[in-house]
Swiss-Prot record:
EC class: ligase
UniProt GO cellular component terms: cytosol
Catalytic activity: tRNA(Ala) + L-alanine + ATP = L-alanyl-tRNA(Ala) + AMP + diphosphate
Keyword Cell wall biogenesis/degradation belongs to the record: no
Source species: Exiguobacterium sibiricum (strain DSM 17290 / CCUG 55495 / CIP 109462 / JCM 13490 / 255-15)
Biological process (GO), any one: alanyl-tRNA aminoacylation
Protein name: Alanine--tRNA ligase
Record function comment: Catalyzes the attachment of alanine to tRNA(Ala) in a two-step reaction: alanine is first activated by ATP to form Ala-AMP and then transferred to the acceptor end of tRNA(Ala). Also edits incorrectly charged Ser-tRNA(Ala) and Gly-tRNA(Ala) via its editing domain.
An MF annotation (GO) of this entry: transferase activity
Note on how the cofactor is bound: Binds 1 zinc ion per subunit.
Gene3D superfamilies noted in UniProt: 2.40.30.130, 3.10.310.40, 3.30.54.20, 6.10.250.550, Bira Bifunctional Protein, Domain 2, Threonyl-trna Synthetase, Chain A, domain 2
PANTHER family listed in its UniProt record: ALANINE--TRNA LIGASE, CYTOPLASMIC (PTHR11777:SF9), ALANYL-TRNA SYNTHETASE (PTHR11777)
Chief location of this protein within or outside the cell: cytoplasm
Pfam family, one: tRNA_SAD
Length: 880
């Protein structure tokens, strides 16, 4: 048997990229795990996920042959992670892709060459088998020509790839035979390549994307056929390194060794503990990379995924005897393992560790809170005469507090109870179905638009320097089809051979303006990039009939453009000020640059304080008032990075980039339009700062005249306040503080008076106390202003009556407030304030509850308050 090459994970990755680069492929950088332009995805979950724009025809790539190593996250099988050899939440997918270029034959032959050639991976061909779709005769023939025996070419009906609407097609897979040690039972019906077994490991998958699926079962041939190939790095590492699981490769073992060092336990000595080692190693990779790409733990979306993963790892760490925050200590190890291809984890290690440590500390506190909730749930069940914790409650504890089912089961057993595990599984299945439906809905690609894809005629953009240009309409479209004319009032799309109109990009909105022909006028409503990179104008024919091939004059609306450029340059200054004030972890997470305002979304852990906002605003204005020259250069991307240019989070750049510098203060890669000097911006004013999601903040601001109007509005408000307060504008804060002091004194006097009145009324209520079967009972409607006053009166009565059951109610408008008290000696006799108040409240249209000694409730029907209070006597008699 041919020996295996002992390649490291880094060598396997680099060899894959080098091989396909030698076959004319362009290397596509690994995209951020946080999707930038795809709201349908929670995470980038495959190598092809970042290339959908190429496959559905929205964008034509410069090179139709692409290769990448894409970091990915999938969490749909999280419960299997650590328990199987190959389930992961974070993994790398190596892929080679053809967008309308080579197809089946080259894809298969190149895959075989890379896998079997001694120059590359050098696998033994005798240990490889393939699967194909039963109707894919072309693939079968190619495999036979490569020397694969017919008995190792297995037809499988499942070899057809589709994810809803869009491109689809048959696929072929390559399997590696790990040997009889992983399965040698001739009676095992699953022991074949493609079956459920451990012996035959899938290492390669090629999708022949040749159909468009309309989502209704109809398939049509794609005008341009595509190739989508995937090879999992972790799986391939387990093959080349000849180890039983992915976790035993050099991609995981350094993390496991570090965990051994922290825990004092040894990997591979106890099967149950091995699961814990694997879970921790997997989850820290996911969390470290995701935080490095801008995601932060939270209670929603991708932030919730991170929170669950961290909490799951912490729970498994308890099996290893680790009872303190420790995951953050593994970040440096993750960074060192992956640094060859992913430098961002080491670069952001301090921030990543701070976030993880904070989350771990919070979870250790949450565990105590969860136990308190679990105790309440169990007690409530017992109070209702039940000895089972419902599946819904168990799942809520799991989903909200990170409590595993087994922990809830252990607790229940300690309290002579059980858990509805079937109900828990049903709740879990429902959540998975919802998640699966969301993935299927969001994973599909758009159908190819052949009309736009075939528009390859060049168009020159002159808008960086000119706001007007004489041009020619080189393509005119109406309802998606090429036409020769479009009538007045109709909407159309067109290309110009020369255009001053900027196409929406990088958050900067498109220019507006007019296009004037010999006998027609067009209003430009929008400009977007066409698949082949030209600026595609959406217009409405204001007058006349728009004609293809007509000579026209294109004019950008100057005042709007001027305002947009001010706001765009201001976003660059804001980005720099944010990093200077909050930290280098700040990354742009989205932006909108319009004529009216700018909006800047950025990653940050926690709210921005008023002091920090003031510093940020001041720094931006200082840069504006410094009259910094804004210079624009085109250079090699390596030179740009050496110059210190900020590459925007999630963006992909070619070899030549456009660098926008505002003096030495701000240097960014940007294709947008800017002022020539920061002084043109005039003034910068932040109007709002808020959180918009997990670890993402948003600042909205205005510049120039917009900033003046905002500040003038603030001044007018201040002057109006001064008039109302009858003081000078400079003395408004002091006057307000004085009024607040007066108000607090008045409130204290009011509260004191209320307390005295309550005491007087409480004293008079003693005459209304009833004796029922030897128990003092007081149930009375009283006249107080709010719940606080009602509780104060209750405290007075409890003190004076001693052993008693008291229920007080008050009505304010259409609202009822209720409080109940049961003294300790009567609790021992079976009386319960929470149960009593619940019954009283239901009789006046409300609800509530509480402890055995004290409870409160509300109602919505004041007319029934006295009737409800009368129930108290019945309650006492029923338990006598």
């Amino acid at each position: 048997m041919k020996p295996l090459k002992p390649l490291t994970g880094a060598q396997i990755r680099q060899m894959y990229l080098d091989f396909f680069q030698s076959k004319g492929h362009a290397i596509e950088p690994s995209a951020s795990l946080v999707p930038i332009e795809d709201p349908t995805l929670l995470w980038i979950n495959s190598g092809v996920a970042t290339l959908k724009k190429y496959f559905d025809g929205r964008v034509i790539p410069q090179n139709p042959r692409i290769v990448n190593a894409q970091k990915s996250i999938r969490t749909n099988d999280i419960e299997n992670v650590g328990k199987t050899a190959r389930h992961h939440t974070f993994f790398e997918m190596l892929g080679n892709f053809s967008v309308g270029d080579y197809f089946r034959e080259d894809a298969i032959k190149w895959g075989w060459e890379l896998l079997t050639s001694d120059e590359w991976y050098g696998l033994d061909p005798d240990r490889l088998s393939v699967t194909i779709h039963p109707e894919d005769d072309a693939a079968r023939q190619i495999w036979l020509e490569l020397g694969v025996p017919a008995e190792r070419i297995i037809p499988l009906e499942d070899n057809f790839w589709e994810i809803g609407e869009g491109p689809s097609g048959p696929n072929t897979e390559i399997f590696f035979d790990r040997g009889p040690a992983f399965g040698d039972d001739p009676n095992d019906s699953e022991l074949y390549p493609g079956g459920e077994n451990e012996r035959y490991l899938e290492i390669w998958n090629i999708v022949f994307s040749q159909y468009n699926h309309d989502g209704h079962g109809n398939y049509t041939e794609l005008p341009r056929k595509n190739i989508d190939t995937g090879m999992g790095l972790e799986r391939m590492a387990s093959v080349m390194q000849d180890v039983p699981t992915n976790f035993d490769t050099d991609l995981f073992m350094p993390i496991i060794h570090k965990t051994e060092e922290i825990s004092g336990k040894r990997y591979r000595e106890d099967t149950k503990l091995d699961v814990a080692f694997k879970v921790i190693a997997d989850h820290i990779r996911t969390v470290a990379f995701a935080i490095g790409d801008g995601a932060l733990p939270s209670n929603e979306g991708r932030g919730y995924v991170l929170r669950r993963l961290l909490r799951r790892a912490v729970r498994y760490a308890k099996m290893l005897g680790i009872e303190r925050p420790f995951m953050y200590e593994l970040v440096d190890t993750v960074g060192s393992v992956m640094v060859d291809f992913y430098p961002q984890v080491p670069e952001k290690a301090d921030f990543i560790k701070r976030v993880i440590k904070n989350e771990e500390e919070r979870f250790h506190e949450t565990l105590h809170d969860g136990l308190a909730i679990l105790n309440t749930v169990a007690q409530a069940a017992k109070n209702n005469g039940e000895h089972i914790i419902s599946g819904e409650d168990a799942f809520r504890l799991y989903d909200t507090y990170g409590f595993p089912l087994e922990l809830t089961v252990e607790y229940a057993e300690d309290h002579q109870m059980s858990v509805d595990e079937e109900g828990f599984k049903r709740a879990m299945d429902e959540q998975r179905k919802r998640a699966r439906a969301a993935r299927e809905d969001g994973g599909s690609m758009q159908q190819q638009s052949e009309v736009l894809a075939t528009l390859t005629v060049p168009s020159q953009f002159v808008g960086y320097t000119d706001l007007e240009a004489d041009a020619k309409i080189i393509a005119l479209l109406h309802d998606g089809e090429r036409v020769t004319e479009v009538a007045a009032g109709e909407e159309a799309q067109l290309l110009l051979d020369v255009t001053p109109f900027y196409a929406e990009s990088g958050g900067e909105v498109a220019d507006s303006g007019t296009i004037t022909g010999p006998d027609f006028v067009l209003d430009v409503k929008d400009v977007q990039k066409a698949p082949n990179g030209q600026n595609l104008h959406t217009v409405v024919v204001r007058t006349g009939i728009a004609l293809a091939d007509a000579s026209v004059h294109a004019a950008v609306e100057a005042s709007s453009r001027q305002a947009i450029t001010k706001n765009h340059t201001a976003t660059h200054l804001l980005h720099k000020a944010l990093k200077d004030t909050l930290g280098t972890h700040v990354n742009q997470a989205g932006s909108l640059v319009s004529a009216e305002r700018l909006r800047f979304d950025f990653s940050h852990f926690g709210a921005v304080t008023a002091e920090e906002l003031a510093t940020i605003e001041q720094d931006v204005n200082q840069a504006i008032w410094a009259s910094l020259a804004v210079e624009i250069e085109e250079m090699n991307i390596a030179d740009a990075k050496a110059k210190g240019a900020m590459a925007l989070f999630g963006e992909k750049y070619g070899e030549t980039v456009r660098v926008v510098s505002a003096g030495t203060y701000s240097i960014e890669l940007c294709g947008g339009i800017h002022v020539r000097n920061t002084a043109e911006i005039g003034l910068f004013k932040i109007v709002s700062e808020s959180g918009i999601g997990a670890g993402t903040r948003r600042i909205e601001a205005v510049t120039g005249a917009g900033a003046y109007h905002v500040m003038n509005g603030h001044l007018q408000t201040l002057e109006q306040a001064a008039r109302v307060l009858k003081t000078k504008t400079t003395e408004v804060p002091g006057r307000i503080e004085a009024l607040q002091v007066q108000l607090r004194e008045t409130e204290r006097a009011h509260e004191s008076l209320q307390a005295k009145l309550a005491n007087i009324e409480a004293a008079s209520l003693k005459d209304d106390v009833e004796q029922i079967n030897g128990v003092q009972v007081l149930a009375k409607q009283v006249d107080v202003s709010d719940m606080d006053a009602l509780r104060g009166m209750m405290d007075e009565l409890k003190s004076s009556l001693g052993s008693a059951i008291i229920v007080l109610g008050s009505a304010q408008g259409d609202k009822v407030n209720l409080v109940a008290s049961v003294s300790k000696d009567l609790i021992d006799q079976g009386y319960h304030a929470g149960k009593l108040i619940k019954e009283v409240a239901t009789r006046c249209g409300g609800g509530g509850g509480g402890r055995p000694d004290m409870a409160q409730a509300g109602g919505k029907d004041p007319a029934k308050l006295n009737e409800a209070l009368a129930f108290t006597s019945h309650y006492v008699q029923s338990l006598a």
